[in-house]
Amino acid sequence: MNRLEKRMSACRKAGRKALIPYITAGDPGPEHTVPLMHALVGAGADVLELGVPFSDPMADGPVIQAACERALAHGTTLRDVFDMVRRFREQDGETPVVLMGYLNPVEYLGPAVFAEEAAAAGVDGVLTVDLPPEEAAPFTQAFAANDLCPIFLVAPTTAGERLEAVCQAARGFVYYVAIKGVTGVAELDVDDIARRVSAVRARTDLPVGVGFGIRDAESAARVGAVADAVIVGSALVNRIAGLTEQPERVPAVLAEALGEMRRALDGLAEEVAS
C-alpha cells in the first residue's frame, strides 16, 4: 500500500471520517501554496487534494474556474505543481497528496514521464477528471509502475458497466460526485447520496469519498454520516477569492473553516462510539 492507501485504511480502522480539502496550486499565488497545505494539515486534513490549474476546467464551477485563472495568471505550470509537492514533502512525509486535474497536461508529458515525475515529487494519487476508465489503461499502467493511485469520479448517473469499470480501475478511494453539474452549485440530497454510496460499496471494498456541494461543517457532517471521506473544495477556494488582496491571511482563514468541519466529523465518531 502507498501513503494514500495506508491513510485511508487507518482512518477506516479508527472510525475516523477522512477529511480531504481541495485547493488550486498557485492560488492566490505560488508562494502561498505550500504554507497553505501545511495549515490545512494542521487543521485536521487527512489527505490533500491539489488542483493543477487548467485553462478549461469543465467540471468546475465559477469559483474554481476563477482560481485556475488566478493561478495561470501567475504562470503556474504542472512542473511548478510538482515542485510545490516536493517542497511540502521537505516537512511532511506522511500526509497523502492527490493531484486533481485534466488530461491535456498529462498527455503533454506522456503518461510514463508524468507518473515518474509525480511520484518523485511525492504525489500519491491522481484524479484526471476527463479520463474515462475504459480508456485509462496506458495511464493506470504508468501509475501502477510508480505506485500512484488512480482515482475516478462516479456521478449520480453512473451505473452498470461504467460503475464496474471505475471500481475495478480505482485505487485509494472512489470519488462520488454528490450533485449533477459542476462544483460549487446545487443542494445536497443526503438520502440519495446514501443510496448511491451503497451502490458503490456493493462493487468495491475501497473507501468512498463524497465531494461537490459541501459548504460548511453542517453539510460536511451530513455527508460524513454516509461516506468514508468528505471532500471540500469550492467552500474553501471561495474564501481565497475574498482574500486576494490579503493573501497572508489565507492559511489562517482556511484552517479555521476546515477545523470546524473536522470537529463536526469527529462529533459523528463520538456519537457512534457512545
Swiss-Prot record:
GO cellular component terms listed in the entry, alphabetical order: cytosol
Leading EC class: lyase
Single GO term (MF): tryptophan synthase activity
Active site positions: 49 (proton acceptor), 60 (proton acceptor)
Record carries keyword Transmembrane helix: no
This protein's pathway: Amino-acid biosynthesis; L-tryptophan biosynthesis; L-tryptophan from chorismate: step 5/5
UniProt entry keywords in alphabetical sequence: Amino-acid biosynthesis, Aromatic amino acid biosynthesis, Lyase, Tryptophan biosynthesis
Reactions catalysed according to its record: (1S,2R)-1-C-(indol-3-yl)glycerol 3-phosphate + L-serine = D-glyceraldehyde 3-phosphate + L-tryptophan + H2O
EC number: 4.2.1.20
Family affiliation: Belongs to the TrpA family.
Subunit comment: Tetramer of two alpha and two beta chains.
Its biological purpose: The alpha subunit is responsible for the aldol cleavage of indoleglycerol phosphate to indole and glyceraldehyde 3-phosphate.
Protein name: Tryptophan synthase alpha chain
Organism for this UniProt entry: Alkalilimnicola ehrlichii (strain ATCC BAA-1101 / DSM 17681 / MLHE-1)
